[in-house]
């Protein structure tokens, strides 16, 4: 099911497309009407998913119907404490809008509800939705997922992913940029990032051409805005009811940064600067001439006058990129009753990632201030990291705390994530401690946590017990330190997940 959006004229973020007709969810006639008319009611056994809407895992259709034992559960208000969301597997939706493992996903959602999880995070990939040709969007698989989450009683956070996933076509989790974008990059390689050695990085389009019509007459910012606008129009019945938050991708891994080595490197400032495509170099030359700075081809001395100028320009370019996307997203989702999220990297080589941090300068403060200006929530990963487990010259735990302090200083709502999905008891406790570190320093705290991510191992008995206990502890952390008893739900969920662990693949 492909949806062609109305045409747009101009770059202005205030120009909104006409409302897309209601046909995007015509495939789900019962859902299309129930989203608007839904009222919490007494639970009863109801068959709500027919084989037409949710065929079995084999994809053969058949006549089998899936019944939720208690019918559509009422969506409760925000739980006390810190809400926990769970990010779905990367390959949940495949090419052509195919939802994989539907039957297992239904059982998984039931288990999450029983454990007290608030909702799920759904990554919506640009390369899948607008993959075939520009301006043609296929949301079918994601519509199914959101509908399933609604009927299971889960809320949804949508992550609009404008970046590449995986290392290449041989990677089982490989999702490239849209094919038509890759064709344009093949014609003009400078659309992609490049370091001083000419090595290209195709994770994300170079921000040097943000406002240039390099994508078949549209600029990258226009393409991102059109995608967000079509998402809003397609999912309007769910926004503010089921979909409560939208994270907007701003760079590699969805984070507002340049491509950069991860924290696996020994030093914080290593990594090559990603500014050697012709568009970035043209901007650098123009800024240098305007500032009266003598150009230097090799930025070897970052402490010198040119080095300081270069780092300010490099970080300002990143901030301007974030500003453009924030402006578009705020305009598009202004009346949608969802909060918008931006993500930063906390476990990267700071200077090459675009975070100009020194002993007297905090590179995260300008970003947090920008997010606060637009009412965005700030997302940061690595909440489970303990320095005792790290052998590096710079504290990785300190990275995360630096981001949290910036959010606290700017009074920005916070969303935490783990970077390693295999968490032990100490790691879960560190997540709680890190969450409290932010929470205790904010006058009107707003915090939630995304567990990254759902997998077969998550539902193994010992891991599931550990996870459900973590969710319970997170629910107990609030201003009044309420002590809530979720024991019954947790015990029920243990037995209901053994089959999921076996079926997941």
Positions of predicted regions on the chain:
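N-terminal chloroplast transit peptides
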Residues: 1-53
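N-terminal carbohydrate-binding accessory modules
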Residues: 37-114
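Hydrophobic faces of well-ordered beta-strands that scaffold small-molecule active sites
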Residues: 82-88, 118-122, 156-160, 244-248, ...
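The substrate-binding groove and active-site-proximal loops of carbohydrate-active enzymes
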Residues: 89-99, 123-139, 203-226, 233, ...
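Short, acidic/polar
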Residues: 94-113, 356-367, 396-400, 434
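Aromatic-lined substrate-binding rim segments of carbohydrate-active enzymes
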Residues: 102-202, 222-244, 264-268, 332
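Substrate-binding cleft of secreted/luminal carbohydrate-active enzymes
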Residues: 157, 161-165, 364-505
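Polysaccharide-binding and catalytic clefts of secreted carbohydrate-active enzymes
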Residues: 182-369, 376
